[in-house]
Amino acid sequence: MSEHTHRTMERHCDVAVVGGSAAGLAAALQLGRQRRSVIVIDAGEPRNAPAAHMHSYLGYEGHPPSDLTSIGREEVRSYGGEVISGRAVDVSRTDDGRFRVQLTGGHSVFARRVLAATGLVDELPDIEGLAEHWGGDVIHCPFCHGYEVRDQRIVGIITHPMGLHPAGLFRQLTSRLTLVLHDGVAADDAEVVALRAAGATIVDEPVRRIVTGVDGHVEAVELMSGDRIDADAIAIGPRFRVRIEPFASLGLLAAAHPTGLGDFVETDATGATSIAGLYAAGNVTDPSQQVLAAAADGSRTGAMISFSLADEDIETAARPSGNEADWDCRYGGDQMWSGNPNGTLVNEVAALRPGRALDVGAGEGGDAMWL
């Protein structure tokens, strides 16, 4: 094995963002535009990965989730930010009060502030065939994917008392709605009566499995009795668990969510957690956020982090460019320059004739570029 294989990377920045989906990238964009050095660490596991399209995001309606992240990455890079594909395994405090974000492979990122934008994991009930259709014919949010199953045979599998909460919304989308009270779940009698009066069919019996048709799509819901309910789509309200394992060394704890369905990270109005210098945004703080709301939350939290850093710099009379030691650390590591072209530069030179040299004074080495 070569010596290069054993090399580890160290990066120094103002802000390390753990999580590279809507909230994390939006925060990084804000920070980059404030001339803050920011590094996004992305494990590539967004909550909406199983979905083919995202909805109710103005300007991105119906686009694959990957469109948002790929464009977002380039926008962050165009303002000098870095995006690293990797997994944060531990975040700890250093002796000088900064943070060390340790990645798989022994790599590290050192930062003055850290943003947790790690999202959450949806935990589906243990029903045969359910997970295979998650993000397709099995949905949970009427706002995210309800319109796409309008007028279809929707079967809502109710696994907890809160499961009836979106039933009225699905009733607005279809007249063919069946609600199955799975495994003896307690349901509000008045709510059940109202839904029945509105035309929904209510079945009180456990579900055995989801039946898949020859076309690979959901065909029916099979009950423990053997009865089948024909279905085109399944609505389910999963439990959820926030991804905060990397922050255990800092003592970050999750609080029980008011719905009783999972946990979340509590923050103040600026996005700050109970750990000084550690912020959180997106689904890790609010599981109900759609992509647009998560991005907005990340953007606002990024702005609040910028305020925090600016106040600290003024208080310590730091120069805007940072002190000499910071720059030595930043450029002393292996391959500091990311190799990613500046987005503005690309736009300016795209129409120029090939074969010419351009001296752009990039400031990170590699100043002369052959077109």
What are the language-model segments listed below?
Residues 3-4, 132-148, 240-292:
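FAD-site-proximal beta/loop scaffold in flavoenzymes
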Residues 7, 13-67, 164-185:
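Beta1-alpha1 glycine-rich phosphate/pyrophosphate-binding loop at the start
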Residues 70-103, 108-111, 174-262, 310-320:
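A Rossmann-like FAD-binding core segment of flavoenzymes
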Residues 107-216:
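Predominantly flavin-linked oxidoreductase catalytic cores and closely associated redox partners
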Residues 283-317:
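A conserved FAD-binding loop/helix module that cradles the flavin
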Residues 366-371:
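Conserved SAM-binding loop of SAM-dependent methyltransferases across substrates and taxa
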